[in-house]
Amino acid sequence: MIRLVTLAALPVLVLCQFDPSKWFMGSNLGGLQGFGVLPARCLNYLEAGYSRGNRLPSHRFFFNSTSGNCEQFVYYGRGGNRNNFRDVFKCMKSCGCKQQRNGGVPCNPPSQPVVRYYYDTFTKLCNTFQHTGCGGNSNHFKDWNDCFFTCGNGFET
């Protein structure tokens, strides 16, 4: 189910999936996992802005809601929209970490699932899950430290 709601006068997209066989391998809330709330700014399309005067373009990051990843682009210095971050950490903290966990799809040839960590926005904890090795989104990390320092309070600026 996809529903657009307003929280504190800010529109957000709420993504809910209910499947007790696939979601929440740890703390189980009846199969409802981590809410996956993406702020509206994360859903904006890429807007590179425009150049004026002798201002040099710079490399920035935007959240690609199709791929579920923070991606680099060239920003021309003026204009654009709020889906524009100075570094990948701010992009991840604002958007990437707020996605539901995604175990990916089986690779071809198949490989054994591996334990990865994802950030749960509901519990504000990094939890383990099985990743199949192919696909998924940017809310998966090789170890707890990477997860915590990217998404938790370990990387506050």
UniProtKB/Swiss-Prot annotation:
Signal peptide limits: 1-16
One Gene Ontology MF term: serine-type endopeptidase inhibitor activity
Domain BPTI/Kunitz inhibitor: 42-95, 97-151
UniProt keyword Disulfide bond, yes or no: yes
Species, as recorded: Pinctada maxima (Silver-lipped pearl oyster)
Entry keyword Transferase: no
GO terms under cellular component: extracellular space
Lineage start: Eukaryota, Metazoa, Spiralia, Lophotrochozoa, Mollusca
UniProt note on tissues of expression: Nacreous layer of shell (at protein level).
Main location, first listed in the record: secreted
Keywords: Disulfide bond, Protease inhibitor, Repeat, Secreted, Serine protease inhibitor, Signal
Disulfide bonds: 42-95, 70-91, 97-151, 107-134, 126-147
Protein's UniProt name: BPTI/Kunitz domain-containing protein 3
